[in-house]
Amino acid sequence: MRVILLLAFLISLTECQWTSEDLALYDLVEEVGVNFYEWFDIPRDASSNQVKKAYRKLTLEWHPDRNSAPDATEKFRQVAGIYEVLKTTELREKYDNVLENGLPSWRHPMYYYRRMRKLAWYEGILVLLFIGTIAHYLMMWAAYFEKTLVYKQNVKKSRKSKKEDPAEAEKLMKQALEEYLPKYSELLPIILARGTVTLFKNLALTAKDAMTPKEVEPEEPTEEELAQQRRQQRAAAAPQQLEFKFEVAQGMKAVSTNDPEMEKKYAAENEVVAQKQSGATWTPDELASLVRLSTEKYPAGTPNRWEQMGRVLNRSAEDVIAMAGKMKQMKQEDYTKLLMTTIQQSVPVEEKSEDDWSQAEQKAFETALQKYPKGTDERWERISEEIGSKTKKQVMVRFKQLAEMIRKKKTNDT
């Protein structure tokens, strides 16, 4: 490559030294092949008028309309070119110099430049590649001999200091020089071909990657967002105390129905219940049912409210009214403790799902996210190993869930 650049630099210097008129003059002299003055039949010191007369005579002789010779057109063009040289004092002096000294020889850069100008672009590339290959091959041998001299000097120094065995040092030197020995696989055309193939492969892979839709990885949550997520999880995991609101009628009698048959039925049921349950102790289940019935199923204003609640509880309306009044006077803390056992027994315990994360697992997950940032090879496998109790799939699902929750929160905030 350095050789090719050097040749291009020399060619540019050559082009700057000679003008296009000089190059055209050299090409014309080489093409005509005869003395311009002899062809025009004039002396070397002929005047401009003599040159014009000779030019008119030759144009009439070689004009394609007057001369039917096959080379008439070519001769007519050469006559016009010679006239352009001889009529100009500067070009005429340069032509006289060519007559005395001749055209640039092979020792001169102009010789090669003039021939390069006549080649096609691909021919010029082949010539430069050939020259560059030879120069590159010679430079590889020069580098090899340079390394040889350096190693030989080191061997001599080791012999003088007696640090190494001479035979062993010679063997090591040969092994080291094998790396610098010129090889045909390192010639310039092979290097260029190999580089071109590698370039096209990389371009194909780049184009394939650009056309393949990539899965957008969600943004990683920040420390503040993770801390807020932990607080929300702890709040959701903490047992919540149920707040019971109830109303008890005071100074009122039970509402009775206007249906006589229903009144008789309710009266008979009340008597049975009163005989069976009057004065019995209320269980926590009955207390919970009483609160639920008084607030949800039979709220204030329901006809025959206390009688209907008594039928459900198998107690008389008076017992229901009395207990409701007592519960209204109880403190909220005592009331909550009284019902806590029943509530815990009534609520089914959910089995822990595989997707549930404990606080320890969540903390290990956040620590692993910081330890293996985005772009780490096999990131999700390493994070899964750090947690220990979660698979790669569960880790990825958890990450997407957190990112989605944070994204929704940002959207709601805005």
From Swiss-Prot:
Q: Where is the composition biased (Acidic residues)?
A: 217-226
Signal peptide region = 1-16
- J domain location is 35-99
What coarse category fits the chief subcellular location reported for this protein? nucleus
For this protein, the parts annotated as crossing the membrane are 125-145
Membrane topology per the record?
A: Single-pass membrane protein
The UniProt keyword set, sorted, is: DNA-binding, Membrane, Nucleus, Repeat, Signal, Transmembrane, Transmembrane helix
Which stretches of sequence are listed as region Disordered? 211-234
SANT domain span: 352-407
- One GO term describing the cellular component: nuclear membrane
Asked whether the keyword Nucleotidyltransferase is assigned, the reply is: no
- Tell me the Pfam families matching this sequence: DnaJ (PF00226), Myb_DNA-binding (PF00249)
- From which domain of life does this come? Eukaryota
Q: Where in the cell is it found?
A: Nucleus membrane
MF GO annotations: DNA binding
Instruction: Indicate the segments forming the Myb-like domain, all copies.
Output: 20-59, 274-320
Name it: Uncharacterized protein F54F2.9
Organism from which the protein derives? Caenorhabditis elegans
